[in-house]
């Protein structure tokens, strides 16, 4: 068993199932992060790892989850696909997974990613499993029973080596846009809940919560005005149509998480967004709630 949050992209639970393990879904709070207490509540003698996700760019609770898991001698693997740039993360986990999908804060031209670790042994194993199980420096001599061909190709690596030089500026741009949302939407606190302002956030996305069940009507209103809001990962993991989801008989244990998710919307935020474009989004929200 591997403990995962119930609101992540399907790749999180798929990675667990790909190695023959079972994902155990954990509740979230309004930060959209797995609650640390869920590790103690859900862990059993079968628990082999905890896999928290830094969803939408927020990495709240990772250090607390790591402390709890370490006491129980359970490894922590952090899905930081949306959280590139938080350097302290690596000290709070055994493995850290990154994505360089073109839609991420730093993206290649296609599909690529990386695994980070402070453990030389885990690094050695990762390199072997990523290249057919071959021993390092000994092509066609297998050191593992199995492996994948999942090395980053040269084109993606070359692209990322250039984009890294622009990452800090892009990260500052995202922080500026997030700060402007917080400042210029603060007067709507009776209508929307803004994400917590923290330096432990890369602002991959900007999620808000609607206080009065107006998500669908705001979504439609904004679209009429030419502003595209979104709901990323609209179906929670335990609500799918696959056998793993339909096997969850105690849906009431997720009622609080479902309530939070049902109020979620994402505002536009990306590296190339101009302040004028952001002002239009802010104006649309004020027009709706006036």
Q: Where do the protein language model's features map onto the residues?
A:
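Short glycine-enriched loop/turn motifs at secondary-structure junctions
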Residues: 106-110, 199-202
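PLP-dependent aminotransferase class I/II
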Residues: 37, 49-53, 62-64, 71, ...
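Conserved PLP-anchoring active-site segment centered on the Schiff-base-forming lysine
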Residues: 1-43, 221
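Glycine-/small-residue-rich active-site loops that bind phosphorylated ligands and cofactors
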Residues: 8, 31, 57, 272-273
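Hydrophobic/aromatic ligand-binding patch that stacks against planar heteroaromatic rings
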Residues: 14-16, 68, 105, 155
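Histidine-centered beta-alpha loop that forms part of the nucleotide-sugar donor binding/catalytic region
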Residues: 7, 21, 28, 54, ...
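Active-site phosphate-binding strand-loop segment of PLP-dependent enzymes
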Residues: 30-108, 114-116, 121, 266
